[in-house]
């Protein structure tokens, strides 16, 4: 897969790094989840409207950290409105998501439409979007790309950078009353949060077929120098799956990345029932 480039670089004034402060990169594109309804034969928990996502983002937006948001032009003003009075710590970069990443989207869709691929999937899992929504798989695959673009564009003002899903703070309590997120993550490692250790006897095909989550995707932390390493490994893992007529969302791509070069990663064990713990367990600034 060719390295993804889609935006002109943006250069801001260089700001001296603040030791353990963490810049946040996130993204939101409307891929139609508001229409993923039981009436269409889909599980009720898949449906999330644009308003649902922005309500959740409003919780995270209370942070004083720099937040860089990739979104569509029609939603940019909504982001600015939510970050009112924090504009100096906010960057919004607009992307025409539907018209970008055509090659990658087509590769994903080709696998998802392959009857041989679908036949491998556990029937109890087949309605989950990673098995049928190319946009869902694509936007999750691009997490490390968006972070690296932000770093290259000069809009990240700390050494530590986190990807946080746009809806990470599902409840206000997820933020844990934190105002400025800081934590001394090891800057020589890529930090994942895993709910299950990998068993070498388990095949990647089985993991995909059964939606067998090991590494979670909503929060990833690394220093600026380590994010290109993650993007490289994710791209390699994506190419590997496509070559085998397989596809999955970021959780399997992250697992595969950590297995390729484990020395570059630190896995932080978390409960399968409690994914959203960054501000409670990995934070040194409780207000």
What are these language model-derived features?
Residues 17-51:
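N-proximal low-complexity "stem/linker" segments adjacent to membrane-targeting elements
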Residues 55-64:
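Short, acidic, metal-binding catalytic loop of nucleotide-sugar glycosyltransferases
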Residues 76-88, 106-108:
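Short, aromatic/basic amphipathic alpha-helical patches
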Residues 90-150:
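Active-site-proximal specificity loops/subdomain of glycosyltransferases
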Residues 135, 139-193:
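GT-A fold catalytic core of metal-dependent nucleotide-sugar glycosyltransferases
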Residues 168-170, 192, 212-287:
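Catalytic core and acceptor-binding pocket of nucleotide-sugar-dependent glycosyltransferases
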Residues 192-200:
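Short beta-strand-to-loop element that shapes/binds the nucleotide-sugar donor at the catalytic cleft/hinge
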């Amino acid at each position: 897969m060719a390295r993804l480039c889609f935006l002109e670089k943006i250069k801001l004034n260089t700001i001296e790094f603040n030791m353990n402060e963490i810049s946040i990169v996130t993204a939101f594109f409307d891929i139609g989840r508001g229409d993923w309804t039981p009436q269409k034969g889909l599980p009720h928990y898949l449906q999330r409207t644009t308003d649902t996502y922005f309500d959740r983002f409003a919780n995270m937006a209370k942070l004083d950290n720099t937040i860089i948001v990739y979104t569509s032009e029609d939603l940019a003003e909504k982001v600015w409105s939510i970050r009112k009075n924090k504009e100096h710590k906010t960057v919004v970069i607009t992307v025409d998501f539907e018209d970008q990443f055509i090659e990658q989207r087509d590769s994903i869709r080709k696998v998802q439409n392959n009857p041989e691929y679908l036949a491998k999937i556990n029937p109890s899992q087949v309605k989950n979007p990673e098995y049928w929504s190319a946009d869902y798989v694509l936007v999750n695959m691009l997490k490390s790309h968006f972070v690296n673009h932000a770093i290259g564009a000069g809009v990240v003002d700390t050494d530590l950078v986190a990807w946080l899903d746009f809806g990470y703070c599902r409840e206000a309590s997820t933020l844990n009353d934190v105002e400025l997120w800081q934590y001394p993550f090891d800057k020589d490692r890529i930090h994942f949060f895993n709910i299950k250790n990998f068993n070498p006897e388990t095949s990647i095909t089985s993991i995909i077929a059964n939606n067998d989550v090991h590494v979670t995707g909503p929060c990833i932390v690394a220093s600026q120098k380590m994010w290109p390493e993650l993007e490289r490994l994710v791209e390699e893992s994506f190419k590997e799956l496509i070559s085998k007529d397989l596809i999955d969302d970021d959780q399997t791509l992250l697992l595969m990345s950590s297995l390729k070069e484990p020395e570059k990663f630190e896995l932080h064990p978390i409960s399968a029932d409690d994914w959203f713990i960054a501000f409670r367990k990995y934070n040194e600034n409780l207000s």
